[in-house]
Amino acid sequence: MLAARGKEVLEKTAKELSEKYKVKVLPVLCDVSQQKDLENLVTVAIKEFEKIDALINSAGISSQHPFQDQPLEDIPRLMYTNYFGPVMLSRLIINHFIENKGGAIINITSGSTLVDPPPRNFIVYTSLKQALKAFDKGLFWEVRDFGIKVTSIMPGVTDTALTGGLKDISVDKSRLMKTEAIEDAVKFALSVPANVCPLEISVINQRTPWTRPVIPYKQAHPKE
Protein backbone atom coordinates (compact mmCIF):
# COMPACT_ATOMS: atom_id res chain seq x y z
CA MET A 1 0.00 0.00 0.00
CA LEU A 2 1.22 3.50 -0.85
CA ALA A 3 0.25 6.68 0.96
CA ALA A 4 0.90 10.29 -0.02
CA ARG A 5 -0.75 13.71 -0.25
CA GLY A 6 -0.51 14.16 -4.01
CA LYS A 7 -3.26 12.17 -5.74
CA GLU A 8 -1.86 12.27 -9.28
CA VAL A 9 1.66 11.13 -8.41
CA LEU A 10 0.32 8.60 -5.89
CA GLU A 11 -1.97 6.89 -8.40
CA LYS A 12 0.67 6.97 -11.14
CA THR A 13 3.28 5.37 -8.87
CA ALA A 14 0.85 2.73 -7.61
CA LYS A 15 -0.01 1.76 -11.19
CA GLU A 16 3.65 1.54 -12.18
CA LEU A 17 4.50 -0.70 -9.22
CA SER A 18 1.48 -2.90 -9.77
CA GLU A 19 2.38 -3.45 -13.42
CA LYS A 20 6.09 -3.96 -12.72
CA TYR A 21 5.74 -6.47 -9.87
CA LYS A 22 2.32 -7.96 -10.77
CA VAL A 23 0.93 -7.30 -7.30
CA LYS A 24 -1.97 -5.40 -5.79
CA VAL A 25 -0.93 -1.86 -4.88
CA LEU A 26 -3.50 0.23 -3.06
CA PRO A 27 -3.03 4.03 -3.16
CA VAL A 28 -4.40 5.94 -0.16
CA LEU A 29 -4.42 9.71 0.18
CA CYS A 30 -2.83 10.67 3.48
CA ASP A 31 -1.33 13.73 5.12
CA VAL A 32 1.10 12.36 7.71
CA SER A 33 0.70 15.50 9.80
CA GLN A 34 -2.97 14.63 10.42
CA GLN A 35 -3.74 11.96 13.04
CA LYS A 36 -7.11 11.09 11.49
CA ASP A 37 -5.42 10.36 8.16
CA LEU A 38 -2.91 8.07 9.88
CA GLU A 39 -5.66 6.22 11.75
CA ASN A 40 -7.55 5.74 8.49
CA LEU A 41 -4.38 4.49 6.79
CA VAL A 42 -3.86 1.70 9.32
CA THR A 43 -7.56 0.77 9.31
CA VAL A 44 -7.65 0.49 5.52
CA ALA A 45 -4.39 -1.48 5.40
CA ILE A 46 -5.61 -4.10 7.88
CA LYS A 47 -9.02 -4.31 6.21
CA GLU A 48 -7.58 -4.79 2.71
CA PHE A 49 -4.54 -6.95 3.49
CA GLU A 50 -5.35 -8.38 6.96
CA LYS A 51 -1.68 -8.53 7.93
CA ILE A 52 0.93 -5.77 7.73
CA ASP A 53 4.54 -6.90 7.51
CA ALA A 54 6.41 -3.59 7.29
CA LEU A 55 5.96 0.14 7.75
CA ILE A 56 8.25 2.45 5.79
CA ASN A 57 8.06 6.14 6.71
CA SER A 58 9.63 8.19 3.94
CA ALA A 59 7.56 11.38 4.01
CA GLY A 60 9.59 14.48 4.71
CA ILE A 61 9.91 18.20 4.12
CA SER A 62 12.86 20.56 4.46
CA SER A 63 13.41 24.22 5.26
CA GLN A 64 16.80 25.84 4.70
CA HIS A 65 17.18 29.08 6.66
CA PRO A 66 19.39 30.62 9.35
CA PHE A 67 17.41 30.11 12.55
CA GLN A 68 16.78 33.84 13.01
CA ASP A 69 15.14 33.88 9.57
CA GLN A 70 13.30 30.56 9.94
CA PRO A 71 9.66 31.14 8.89
CA LEU A 72 7.54 30.53 11.97
CA GLU A 73 4.99 28.53 10.01
CA ASP A 74 7.70 26.10 8.88
CA ILE A 75 8.51 24.93 12.41
CA PRO A 76 5.21 23.12 13.14
CA ARG A 77 5.14 21.79 9.56
CA LEU A 78 8.59 20.28 10.05
CA MET A 79 7.64 18.88 13.46
CA TYR A 80 4.42 17.25 12.32
CA THR A 81 5.74 15.83 9.05
CA ASN A 82 9.25 14.79 10.03
CA TYR A 83 8.65 13.60 13.60
CA PHE A 84 5.02 13.43 14.68
CA GLY A 85 3.89 11.49 11.59
CA PRO A 86 6.39 8.61 11.82
CA VAL A 87 6.05 8.33 15.62
CA MET A 88 2.24 8.40 15.57
CA LEU A 89 2.03 5.89 12.72
CA SER A 90 4.45 3.59 14.54
CA ARG A 91 2.24 3.81 17.63
CA LEU A 92 -0.89 3.03 15.62
CA ILE A 93 0.64 -0.08 14.09
CA ILE A 94 2.85 -1.46 16.87
CA ASN A 95 0.17 -3.58 18.57
CA HIS A 96 -0.64 -5.21 15.23
CA PHE A 97 3.01 -6.23 14.97
CA ILE A 98 3.04 -7.47 18.57
CA GLU A 99 -0.05 -9.61 17.94
CA ASN A 100 1.59 -11.08 14.84
CA LYS A 101 4.90 -11.66 16.63
CA GLY A 102 6.92 -9.62 14.18
CA GLY A 103 7.13 -6.74 11.75
CA ALA A 104 9.51 -4.04 10.59
CA ILE A 105 9.50 -0.27 11.00
CA ILE A 106 11.87 1.64 8.74
CA ASN A 107 12.19 5.39 9.12
CA ILE A 108 14.05 7.48 6.55
CA THR A 109 15.91 10.02 8.68
CA SER A 110 18.80 12.00 7.18
CA GLY A 111 22.53 11.94 6.59
CA SER A 112 22.59 15.38 8.22
CA THR A 113 22.23 13.61 11.59
CA LEU A 114 25.78 12.33 11.12
CA VAL A 115 27.15 15.89 11.14
CA ASP A 116 28.12 17.45 14.46
CA PRO A 117 27.26 20.24 15.00
CA PRO A 118 24.13 20.17 12.83
CA PRO A 119 24.58 21.77 9.40
CA ARG A 120 24.00 25.52 9.24
CA ASN A 121 20.57 26.59 8.01
CA PHE A 122 19.18 23.12 8.78
CA ILE A 123 19.17 23.02 12.58
CA VAL A 124 15.39 22.61 12.99
CA TYR A 125 15.23 19.97 10.25
CA THR A 126 18.28 18.10 11.54
CA SER A 127 17.32 18.20 15.22
CA LEU A 128 13.94 16.64 14.41
CA LYS A 129 15.62 13.94 12.32
CA GLN A 130 17.98 13.29 15.24
CA ALA A 131 14.96 12.97 17.52
CA LEU A 132 13.42 10.43 15.14
CA LYS A 133 16.66 8.45 15.06
CA ALA A 134 16.75 8.43 18.87
CA PHE A 135 13.12 7.29 18.91
CA ASP A 136 13.96 4.42 16.54
CA LYS A 137 16.79 3.19 18.73
CA GLY A 138 14.72 3.40 21.90
CA LEU A 139 11.74 1.70 20.26
CA PHE A 140 13.90 -1.21 19.13
CA TRP A 141 15.08 -1.90 22.67
CA GLU A 142 11.45 -1.92 23.84
CA VAL A 143 10.00 -4.21 21.16
CA ARG A 144 12.94 -6.39 20.08
CA ASP A 145 11.66 -9.40 22.05
CA PHE A 146 8.40 -9.28 20.10
CA GLY A 147 10.40 -9.96 16.95
CA ILE A 148 9.95 -6.40 15.67
CA LYS A 149 12.77 -4.75 13.73
CA VAL A 150 13.29 -0.97 13.82
CA THR A 151 15.73 0.65 11.41
CA SER A 152 16.87 4.22 10.70
CA ILE A 153 18.13 4.84 7.18
CA MET A 154 20.26 7.96 6.85
CA PRO A 155 20.55 9.02 3.19
CA GLY A 156 22.72 11.77 1.82
CA VAL A 157 21.57 14.39 -0.69
CA THR A 158 19.28 12.60 -3.13
CA ASP A 159 18.02 13.71 -6.53
CA THR A 160 14.38 14.40 -5.64
CA ALA A 161 11.91 17.27 -5.79
CA LEU A 162 12.82 18.05 -2.17
CA THR A 163 16.47 18.57 -3.08
CA GLY A 164 15.52 20.77 -6.02
CA GLY A 165 14.48 23.53 -3.64
CA LEU A 166 17.75 23.63 -1.69
CA LYS A 167 20.53 26.18 -2.04
CA ASP A 168 24.23 25.46 -2.54
CA ILE A 169 23.60 22.11 -4.26
CA SER A 170 25.96 21.11 -7.07
CA VAL A 171 24.54 21.32 -10.58
CA ASP A 172 26.53 18.17 -11.31
CA LYS A 173 23.78 15.59 -10.96
CA SER A 174 26.31 12.77 -10.75
CA ARG A 175 27.12 13.99 -7.23
CA LEU A 176 23.53 13.41 -6.09
CA MET A 177 22.33 9.98 -5.02
CA LYS A 178 19.53 8.28 -6.92
CA THR A 179 16.46 7.08 -5.05
CA GLU A 180 17.43 3.53 -6.00
CA ALA A 181 20.27 3.73 -3.44
CA ILE A 182 17.72 4.24 -0.66
CA GLU A 183 15.51 1.54 -2.15
CA ASP A 184 18.43 -0.89 -1.94
CA ALA A 185 18.99 0.03 1.72
CA VAL A 186 15.32 -0.63 2.49
CA LYS A 187 15.47 -4.00 0.72
CA PHE A 188 18.56 -4.91 2.72
CA ALA A 189 16.88 -4.00 6.01
CA LEU A 190 13.93 -6.21 5.11
CA SER A 191 16.04 -9.13 3.89
CA VAL A 192 18.26 -9.82 6.91
CA PRO A 193 17.66 -12.99 8.97
CA ALA A 194 14.90 -12.95 11.56
CA ASN A 195 17.42 -12.93 14.42
CA VAL A 196 19.22 -9.82 13.13
CA CYS A 197 18.22 -6.15 13.08
CA PRO A 198 20.17 -3.41 11.26
CA LEU A 199 19.60 -0.49 13.64
CA GLU A 200 21.13 2.21 11.44
CA ILE A 201 22.12 2.30 7.77
CA SER A 202 24.04 5.28 6.36
CA VAL A 203 24.01 5.80 2.59
CA ILE A 204 26.10 8.88 1.81
CA ASN A 205 27.22 10.66 -1.36
CA GLN A 206 30.65 9.52 -2.55
CA ARG A 207 31.50 13.07 -3.71
CA THR A 208 30.27 16.16 -1.91
CA PRO A 209 26.99 17.47 -3.34
CA TRP A 210 27.49 20.90 -1.76
CA THR A 211 29.10 23.92 -3.39
CA ARG A 212 30.07 25.37 0.02
CA PRO A 213 30.77 23.76 3.41
CA VAL A 214 27.66 22.86 5.39
CA ILE A 215 29.55 23.78 8.56
CA PRO A 216 31.73 26.93 8.56
CA TYR A 217 35.38 26.19 9.36
CA LYS A 218 35.34 28.33 12.51
CA GLN A 219 32.27 26.51 13.82
CA ALA A 220 33.87 23.13 13.22
CA HIS A 221 37.24 24.24 14.69
CA PRO A 222 36.35 26.73 17.47
CA LYS A 223 39.77 26.49 19.19
CA GLU A 224 41.80 27.49 16.12
Go through each PLM region and give its residues.
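Alpha-helical segment proximal to the catalytic Tyr-Lys
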Residues: 95, 137-142
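Substrate-binding pocket helix/loop in short-chain dehydrogenase/reductase
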Residues: 66-67, 74-76
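C-terminal helical subdomain
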Residues: 146-148, 152-153, 168-212
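Active-site helix of classical SDR
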Residues: 90, 128-129
